[in-house]
Amino acid sequence: KKEMILIIGMVAILAMVPSACADAIIIDHTCTDLSEIPDEWIDQSKDNLHIAYQHTSHGSQLVTGMNALKNFPAFGLKYEWSDSGASGLDLDDKGIPGEKPDLSQGDYIDGNGVTPWVTATRNLLNSTDNYHVNVIMWSWCSINGHNISRYLENMEILVSEYSAGGSNPRAAEHPVKFVFMTGHAQGQGEGGFIHTANEQIRQHCLDNGRILFDFADIENYDPDGNYYYDRPMWDDLNYTKISYRDSNWGVEWCTANVGSELEQLTTGNNVEGYSGCSSCAHCGLAGAGNTMNCVLKGRAVWHMMARLAGWDGGQPEQPICGDVTGDGSIDTVDLVLLLKHCINPAGNPIANACTGDIDGNGYINVLDVRLLMGYLANPTGYSLNCLYAGV
């Protein structure tokens, strides 16, 4: 009783502690194995996602890769997609009209006080004709030398306005998910601007629970996990082995893995009715080994779509909402720790931040303590709604 009285008396002085509960979705070189994706989530993405994607040549690599999967005979209609949404996944290619066609050309502040691609996205999403659109993607051409902080700040403007709980009226019933993206290799190696820029974007997405299509990471590794960015390497998968730009990991991998599904998707080798991946922007002519760059990115797109549709990516079972001690049960010990955490987070760490954000609003504060108190008193009368946590 004394413990509960103390808790009640201290509730009013609790601080608001960010929970960082919503896990980031990072789509990188580890997300290119189609066999990992359950069929049901491929179907769910086709049924529920409506994507608008804006890009120029480098960004087209994703679409070229998706077309390779779509046209590969062994897959049938499994990876069907259409620009109009008439069949398969609904992806409106180059679907965000505006002053500038990609992030690189739109790296400035326009008359609305934001980047032109934010203005273009707002114009698209504010039209009731586009209330079905629930995923927005913008890609870079060259990221080299661009203002990455400006990019992140302007992406966050869109997130704050149109994502779940956003300030724009359409967010209440038609929320939108926004995909961040890194930029392609240009032979700089790890000491160059591009690597630093990509790392800044990655860290931002990890810290803020964002969705990232890691364009750069996907092309930095071959399918066996060998890393090439530090050789250095370029956007066509060329890299320096002995002399400047003398090798290509896509060509080498295909030569060493003839007859594999990935090699056949890339080259069309011994596949009746299929001549390989079509010409991949900046990467090679149709069927060349380095068009694997597009194939891998197309595979990763489907991995991302399944995640956006609700697939957990095969992650371990989520923790129990309210179980801030991590002992597998919810009791007054959890309530005391949650209270102490709100007063002094550093001195009273909890097992998993997600489990303390009881109302799922992104913060741990007085409301979460009150909900947990109510739940302990009357479990059937209170709902625990931690983001990405089981009850």
Language-model segment annotations:
Residues D222-G273:
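Mobile gating loops/cap/lid regions near enzyme active sites that modulate substrate access
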Residues P18-A22:
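Sec/Tat signal peptide C-region and signal peptidase I cleavage site
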Residues G106-G192:
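Extracellular-facing segments of soluble proteins and assemblies that are Gly/Ser/Thr-biased and enriched
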Residues G183-D224:
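Substrate-gating cap/lid alpha-helix
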Residues E252-P316:
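Extracellular low-complexity, Gly/Ser/Thr-rich intrinsically disordered linkers
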Residues I25-N134, L285-A286, L296, A300, ...:
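N-terminal carbohydrate-binding/catalytic regions of secreted carbohydrate-active enzymes
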Residues I7-A15:
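Bacterial N-terminal signal peptides
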Residues P316-V391:
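Cellulosome-associated attachment modules in secreted, modular CAZymes
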